């Protein structure tokens, strides 16, 4: 049985997305490979960190003044009392994400003033 590339390509053109997905999975399992794109070199990671323009504010601990922290979280996020309490109780958790550096620092200062431990990511 000769392998005819043109016939294979023609069959793939007529296949559905579901069939193609199953084919990829079967090839990955059979040949122990992955279809994922290769990751960029580590040198590019340093440049990406220097040019970071989006920050997440993470509450790592509520501290001793939990009520003040919950009040501040409500003001920052617009959450209700129950949701804000659950967020604070679930620390470490992200309070707000996708912020500019100045916005993230402003929120960090407010929460730290209320007694929380904060990290910016």
Curated annotation (Swiss-Prot):
Q: Which GO terms describe its molecular function?
A: mRNA binding; structural constituent of ribosome
Q: Give the matching SUPFAM superfamilies.
A: ClpS-like, Ribosomal protein L7/12, oligomerisation (N-terminal) domain
One of its GO biological process terms is: translation
Annotated Gene Ontology cellular components are: cytosolic large ribosomal subunit
Q: Which Pfam families match?
A: Ribosomal_L12 (PF00542), Ribosomal_L12_N (PF16320)
Quaternary context? Homodimer. Part of the ribosomal stalk of the 50S ribosomal subunit. Forms a multimeric L10(L12)X complex, where L10 forms an elongated spine to which 2 to 4 L12 dimers bind in a sequential fashion. Binds GTP-bound translation factors.
Family, similarity comment? Belongs to the bacterial ribosomal protein bL12 family.
Q: What does this protein do?
A: Forms part of the ribosomal stalk which helps the ribosome interact with GTP-bound translation factors. Is thus essential for accurate translation.
Protein name, as recorded: Large ribosomal subunit protein bL12
Gene symbol of the encoding locus? rplL
